[in-house]
From Swiss-Prot:
This is Arginase. It comes from Plasmodium falciparum (isolate 3D7). It catalyses: L-arginine + H2O = urea + L-ornithine. GO terms for cellular component: cytoplasm; cytosol. Optimum pH is 8.5-9.
Length: 411
């Protein structure tokens, strides 16, 4: 009997993560500027309060809590005096009118940069909605072309709160890069999904063969030309893939970084996709699996197929970007962008378990949990993790999913 136990312990140790030590770096990313709802910035501290540290500890992992990323308020106040961007449309109150001439390109220009006269797809926007003629312009102008970023000196000006997001993202990138160098598993807790740009790019600079599993109800793959809202959390994946055609104010720090490749990415569980996102998904060669694919083939077959597709040799490090709205709102009501028919409790837990069993997960985002929208849950007999008895439903699920990635299992 003793030999059997020792053999089990030995085999278990041999299956430890191939890339990181058994040490978690916790980073709180309380960014809410990428979407319109308040409350999502509270998630980091809420999960700490509900028992995050105890959950990690009981699973045998050490942890370092780095605290929350500075939201950049001080830097933003200082930059008001030295802001180097000017909006060329300040003197034009009708900059969304399709009848404007070519000189109105809806973009920021840094001082000293000469503005090019060229067709700009953002002129196809009218009153916040994309003109139907965009379909023709989309193909004609080859909007979706990876590794073609920043090819001109024109700047986007239709991304909401981009100054706050850009400054925050630089702070997160620097902090996460430092933690990755320690060979720790890095847990990045949002905040909205806009925080994934910095977390993925920092992981990608550390692990150049990184693969990404993006779990979400939404594609988050709009580009500024197609976004109906201008909210950055709906464009984050496109930005991370290098699909933007112009420069982004306050993201100059990222221009020379290695960007994610679509073929190294799999989106799991999408079910609420904007019209132009459908075109982008099909055109950019990314791997995606809708909720119908999961219903038809099962979550096990779906994630195994996705892993085979993006990592056929099963030897690459993995980053998980988990948007909690991928889960059906029956199980995860505490999120701002709810869509019916999401992953159920067993599916999302099994998905995390399968990814954990690869022993190659090096970093993870958990985003879009909004405690202010959550519901109190009831403790049941199977709740064995050290989570507060009065924990909310989505908060408890978030901690359970983190635990799954760290190896929490039934037996």
């Amino acid at each position: 009997m003793l030999d059997t136990i020792e053999s089990y312990i030995k085999s278990h140790k041999e299956k430890e993560n191939l890339y990181v030590k058994k040490n978690v770096s916790i980073i709180g990313s309380p960014l809410a500027a990428g979407q319109p709802l308040g409350g999502v910035q509270l998630a980091c501290d809420d999960l700490r309060k509900l028992g995050l540290h105890n959950v990690i500890d009981v699973l045998g992992w050490k942890y370092e809590d780095i605290g929350n990323i500075d939201n950049g308020d001080n830097e933003m106040k200082q930059e008001k005096k030295t802001n180097n961007y000017i909006n060329n449309n300040d003197n034009n109150n009708d900059n969304n009118n399709d009848n404007n001439n070519d000189n109105n390109n809806n973009c920021y220009i840094p001082n000293g940069v000469i503005k090019e006269k060229k067709h700009d797809l953002s002129n196809n926007k009218m009153n916040g909605y994309v003109n139907h003629n965009f379909y023709g312009n989309y193909e004609e102008n080859n909007v979706i072309s990876t590794n073609d970023k920043y090819k001109n000196n024109c700047y986007y000006d239709n991304i909401r709160n981009i100054k706050e997001i850009g400054i925050f993202s630089k702070n997160l990138f620097d902090t996460m890069s430092n933690e990755l160098r320690k060979k720790n598993f890095v847990l990045n807790i949002g905040g909205d999904h806009g925080v994934a740009f910095s977390s993925i790019l920092s992981s990608l600079q550390m692990y150049q063969n990184l693969r990404v599993i993006w779990i979400d109800a939404h594609g988050d793959i709009n580009i500024p030309e197609t976004s109906p809202s201008g909210n950055y959390h709906g464009m984050t994946l496109a930005h991370t893939l290098g699909l933007f055609k112009k420069k982004v104010p306050y993201f100059e720090w990222s221009e020379n970084l290695t960007y994610l490749k679509p073929e190294n990415t799999a989106i799991i569980g999408i079910r609420d996709i904007d019209a132009y996102e459908k075109i982008i998904l099909k055109k950019c060669n990314i791997n995606y699996y809708t909720i119908f694919d999961i219903e038809k083939n099962g979550i096990y077959n779906t994630i195994c197929t996705a892993l085979e597709k993006i990592d056929p040799n099963s030897n690459c490090p993995i980053h998980i970007s988990l948007d909690i709205d991928s889960v059906d709102n029956v199980f995860a009501p505490g999120t701002g962008t709810v869509a019916k028919g999401g992953l159920n409790y067993r599916e999302i837990n099994l998905l995390m378990k399968i990814l954990a069993e690869t022993k190659r997960v090096v970093s993870m985002d958990l985003v879009e949990y909004n405690p202010s929208l959550d519901e109190v849950d009831k403790k049941v007999h199977g709740d064995s993790l050290p989570i507060l008895d009065n924990a909310t439903k989505t908060g408890k699920l978030c901690l359970e999913l983190i635990a799954r990635v760290l190896g929490y299992d039934i037996v």
